């Protein structure tokens, strides 16, 4: 947006809010929320906790995924009438999996000034504490709820060399980590981060397989909001099925059923059964084929 072309209008401020700890908000953000003419909130009731905490009495209106297109037209009119508006989401930085995209583009269409304010973001907070490279990364949002769609996404990023960030909901975390193991491998390093900045915050880095074991042993850790950080593809670590594994499988396969041989071999080498099974099938190692 060329500053010379901006007419005398109001300003749309994009204001991040805390992702858990109410202290994680800047003085500048509070000052803006106190002095704008209107706050466009994703959920007014939810945002009142923060606004009351800082004695922010500014009028609020709702802007969410269901009303964004209609509400944006009203907000644009107010901005044109020199009203300053702050956009906030339930937590974190607006537009990161939250409403606001349509409104921002309407501001560009109507040459209205946009001012982004730095602040909290769950994805970045998890990334910087993940112990994984943060110089190059990609953000993929929420993993799909349906397994077929989720596996399709994981296959697409299987050879992505950058660090990968996903969000996930609590009731699907076991299924999603299992899919990560089966598609990206049991030794892919991931960082599991939940309840960031809150009392029960926990950050755990390990192989995907060990994270799954840890989760199953610590059921309460599945409660809360989750960020999954996945290490990028490294072809040095992709051959997880060693010659010793294949040799063991070959010997067992001559005496046992294919499925039984898979189960025992996986147990010996602490590999997920599904991962070893899929490897065997994809490399033409089956009930009626020898191992080459």
UniProtKB/Swiss-Prot annotation:
Record-linked PROSITE patterns: RSMI
Pfam families: RsmI_C, TP_methylase
Keyword Membrane: no
Gene3D superfamilies registered for this protein in UniProt: Cobalt-precorrin-4 Transmethylase, Domain 1, Methyltransferase, Cobalt-precorrin-4 Transmethylase, Domain 2
Gene Ontology CC, one term: cytoplasm
InterPro entries linked: 4pyrrol_Mease, 4pyrrol_Methylase_sf, 4pyrrole_Mease_sub1, 4pyrrole_Mease_sub2, rRNA_ssu_MeTfrase_I, RsmI_HTH, SAM_MeTrfase_RsmI_CS
Record keywords: Cytoplasm, Methyltransferase, rRNA processing, S-adenosyl-L-methionine, Transferase
Subcellular compartments: Cytoplasm
UniProt key word Iron-sulfur: no
Protein name: Ribosomal RNA small subunit methyltransferase I
GO molecular function terms noted in the UniProt entry: rRNA (cytosine-2'-O-)-methyltransferase activity
Similarity comment: Belongs to the methyltransferase superfamily. RsmI family.
First-listed, main subcellular location of the protein, grouped into a coarse class: cytoplasm
Taxonomic source organism: Buchnera aphidicola subsp. Baizongia pistaciae (strain Bp)
Catalytic activity line of the entry: cytidine(1402) in 16S rRNA + S-adenosyl-L-methionine = 2'-O-methylcytidine(1402) in 16S rRNA + S-adenosyl-L-homocysteine + H(+)
EC number: 2.1.1.198
Organism lineage string: Bacteria, Pseudomonadati, Pseudomonadota, Gammaproteobacteria, Enterobacterales
Role, per record: Catalyzes the 2'-O-methylation of the ribose of cytidine 1402 (C1402) in 16S rRNA.
